[in-house]
UniProtKB/Swiss-Prot annotation:
Family per similarity comment: Belongs to the prefoldin subunit alpha family.
Protein name (database record): Prefoldin subunit alpha
Gene Ontology MF, one: unfolded protein binding
UniProt record, GO biological process: protein folding
Keyword flag Chaperone: yes
Keywords carried by this UniProt record: Chaperone, Cytoplasm
Xref: SUPFAM superfamilies: Prefoldin
Length: 147
């Protein structure tokens, strides 16, 4: 079909598929980051519960991937410093920290769900375009065999 008839060219269809593939990859990376944030919040809450139980020692990851642990002793378990967002932190009691972390987890979970919905829409559109491209390729192959 020509552009004047309201259709799109094969090159435009291929470009749209390429764009959607990159968009899907970006959404998947963001989704992974959100899930890692949720896991970090859960770990922080577990640490607070350990502190609330009166345990004065804790194993702490030194790096983000967990290659190195250190035993930390002498923990005073009545206050922690919690990240509020952007570059803001606050020293709060343990129960307040859990409330802040729960709220943050809810926000991130909502964002992850919204992102997942967008990812499903993009994947569906991408799959439709790939199906169309496959049909075009099969039709071209049949025409070539008929010649």
């Amino acid at each position: 079909m020509s552009q004047g008839q309201g259709g799109i060219t094969l090159d435009e269809l291929i470009a749209q598929a390429d764009y959607l593939k990159r968009y899907i990859d970006s959404l998947q990376r963001t989704q992974l980051e959100l899930l890692e944030s949720i896991n970090s919040i859960d770990s922080a809450k577990q640490a607070i519960e350990t502190m609330k139980s009166g345990n004065k020692e804790m194993l702490v990851f030194i790096d983000r991937k967990g290659y190195l642990l250190a035993k930390v002793g002498g923990i005073i378990g009545d206050k922690v410093t919690v990240h509020l967002g952007l570059s803001y932190y606050a020293e709060v009691d343990l129960d307040s920290a859990i409330k802040i972390l729960d709220k943050r987890k809810d926000e991130i979970s909502k964002a992850a769900q919204d992102l997942n919905n967008e990812l499903q829409k993009a994947a569906s559109t991408y799959n439709q375009i790939v199906d169309i491209l496959n049909q075009i390729q099969q039709a071209a192959a049949r025409r070539q065999q008929g010649e």
